[in-house]
């Protein structure tokens, strides 16, 4: 019996041991409940994590696209019409003018101007005019000459006096009183606004800008740009013009470009 009592003495739980065991059991139950709760909540947590990742990717893509747009110099409108975008890689051309080549000369003509059969001056070989306003036109005259250079005609002013038919003829020759800045008995005036003597391709040229006015004119006058040179025994003259009112409404660009582009071979 002594040995049995000893065995029971060693294995019977004490009150402290029972309390510790109950504490551990309660702790294990709490941990299991927390783990179970975590398992129940894990689908929502995984979904939130996935949404956050998707939002981050979208935000990064938006920033990338925005940066590319800011770094590009091509506007949406330009790209739509293929201007600045230059979609096909072809060099841009000036569609406002067309190159016209004649016998011994070349000139740029406004694209919206059409050929005209009207012969206004001797030796005229070309004439184009604006469809909406025939006052805006350009003509080329070629006549034989014994001069070797345009300078053989004298100064630009002296040359103009020898081809004054380019300024137009006075239709009325009766007596008039001084009115509107005109001299007595004169119904037409011509004022030289500018002259220059450029050298193009080794040839001397005269460039003369004249403003003509008539007493009954409704355009406020006409701007005449005359370009002339001598080549191979021929006098080449280009005369481009526009009414004064239209001159300042956009015609200046076309008239000046046509006159300055004229050249003889």
UniProtKB/Swiss-Prot annotation:
Please tell me where this protein is predominantly located. plastid
GO molecular-function annotation terms?
calcium ion binding
Q: Where is the composition biased (Basic and acidic residues)?
A: 27-38
User: Where is region (Disordered) located?
Assistant: 11-45
Q: Give the stretch annotated as transit peptide in the record, renumbered to this chain.
A: 1-69
A GO cellular component term found in this entry reads: extrinsic component of membrane
Locations of Polar residues compositional bias?
Answer: 15-26
Q: Which UniProt keywords apply?
A: Chloroplast, Membrane, Photosynthesis, Photosystem II, Plastid, Thylakoid, Transit peptide
Q: Show the stretches that span the lipid bilayer.
A: none
Supply the Pfam families for this chain: PsbP (PF01789)
| Cellular localisation | Plastid, Chloroplast thylakoid membrane
InterPro entries recorded: Mog1/PsbP_a/b/a-sand, PsbP_C
One GO BP on record is: photosynthesis
PANTHER family found in the cross-reference section: OXYGEN-EVOLVING ENHANCER PROTEIN 2-1, CHLOROPLASTIC, PTHR31407
Q: Which family does it belong to?
A: Belongs to the PsbP family.
- Known function: May be involved in the regulation of photosystem II.
Q: What is this protein called?
A: Oxygen-evolving enhancer protein 2, chloroplastic
What is this protein's gene name?
PSBP
